[in-house]
Amino acid sequence: MNFAKVFVLVAMAVLLLVGQSEAGGLKKLGKKLEGAGKRVFNAAEKALPVVAGAKALGK
């Protein structure tokens, strides 16, 4: 094999190894977004019956 082919193989191996280490930061961001979504869902779950009750009183 010539040098160019070896260089490409080594570069691809390095990119694969470095690319997998980035998942830690993305995982943390995903967890934060998931937590925010859960809080919004829980707040909406608590508020919707109150809103529905207020609409029923207005009729």
Curated annotation (Swiss-Prot):
Residues 1-23 form the signal peptide. One of its GO terms (cellular component) is extracellular space. Pfam families: Cecropin (PF00272). The keyword Ion transport does not apply. It is found in: Secreted. Keywords: Antibiotic, Antimicrobial, Immunity, Innate immunity, Secreted, Signal. The keyword Cell inner membrane does not apply. InterPro entries: Cecropin, Cecropin_insect. Its main location: secreted. One of its GO terms (biological process) is innate immune response. Cecropins have lytic and antibacterial activity against several Gram-positive and Gram-negative bacteria. Belongs to the cecropin family. This is Cecropin-C type 2. The gene is CECC2.
